[in-house]
Swiss-Prot record:
PROSITE patterns associated with the record: SAM_MT_UBIE, UBIE_1, UBIE_2
Top-level enzyme category: transferase
Descriptive protein name: Demethylmenaquinone methyltransferase
UniProt-listed InterPro entries: MenG_heptapren, SAM-dependent_MTases_sf, UbiE/COQ5_MeTrFase, UbiE/COQ5_MeTrFase_CS
Gene field: menG
One GO molecular-function entry: demethylmenaquinone methyltransferase activity
Similarity remark: Belongs to the class I-like SAM-binding methyltransferase superfamily. MenG/UbiE family.
Record's keyword annotation contains Methyltransferase: yes
Swiss-Prot/TrEMBL keywords: Menaquinone biosynthesis, Methyltransferase, S-adenosyl-L-methionine, Transferase
């Protein structure tokens, strides 16, 4: 029987959890850290605020958010892969970040009340969910009026020549890296599939607006290999 997208993604991340951080650095040539740092600068996270990191994986962005909100703030990381969360919990415990809570849950049904968080992020996770728009609407639902919804994700480069090289890299080279470093050719083939079919920057910006967000900002990284999208939930009338 053919697996659903949700089942396949779950299997992928359960299997690659122990090598995920290393492979992130290999695949992006360490650029993912710089992309996240610049995204955090643009977000301008306020101390004492409350944040949710959806599809938090091994909790790298969750930890960055926790450091930004400080001990008086609160950060919740949510992921549906228990193995990925297990890696994240080890990091959080090592850093003694008491303001962090990691939860096993589904991005399609966020287990929170409306208007709960000041910031809701999703990093390299939106392309893996069954329904992009549904998850964006869920993120918009749980963010407070005036709060920010942020997505950092792979994108579709538009520069001629570079785009072709990017496609070749993701289709042929990245799965080989997966086989070499993580013994997971099949799983990293899935990651290139999900990246290749993900909406481009303009299309995702339109989706942010359709989800109910305004003042949408788009920031491309490394010739459009990745991009940040940030939208604000309208203030209550």
């Amino acid at each position: 029987m053919q697996q659903s997208k949700e089942e396949r993604v779950h299997d992928v991340f359960e299997k690659i959890s122990d090598k995920y951080d290393v492979m992130n650095s290999v695949i992006s040539f360490q650029r993912h850290k710089a992309w996240r740092k610049e995204t955090m600068r643009i977000m301008d996270v306020k101390p004492g605020s409350k944040a949710l990191d959806v599809c938090c994986g091994t909790a790298d962005w969750t930890i960055a958010l926790a450091e930004a909100v400080g001990e008086q703030g609160k950060v919740v990381g949510l992921d549906f892969s228990e193995n990925m969360l297990s890696v994240g919990k080890q990091k959080v415990e090592a850093l003694q970040l008491k303001q962090v809570e990691l939860l096993h849950g589904n991005a399609m049904e966020l287990p929170f009340e409306d208007n709960t968080f000041d910031y809701v992020t999703i990093g390299f996770g939106l392309r893996n969910v069954p329904d992009y728009m549904h998850v964006l609407k869920e993120m918009t639902r749980v963010v407070k009026p005036g709060g920010k919804v942020i997505c950092l994700e792979t994108s579709q480069p538009t520069m001629i020549g570079f785009r072709q090289g990017y496609i070749l890299y993701f289709k042929y080279i990245m799965p080989l890296f997966g086989k070499l470093f993580a013994k997971s050719y099949k799983e990293y083939s899935w990651l290139q599939e999900s990246a290749s079919t993900f909406p481009g920057m303009k299309e995702l910006a339109n989706m942010f607006e359709k989800a109910g967000l305004e003042r949408v900002q788009v920031k491309p990284f490394t010739f459009g290999v990745a991009a940040m999208h940030l939208g604000m939930k309208p203030e209550s009338k």
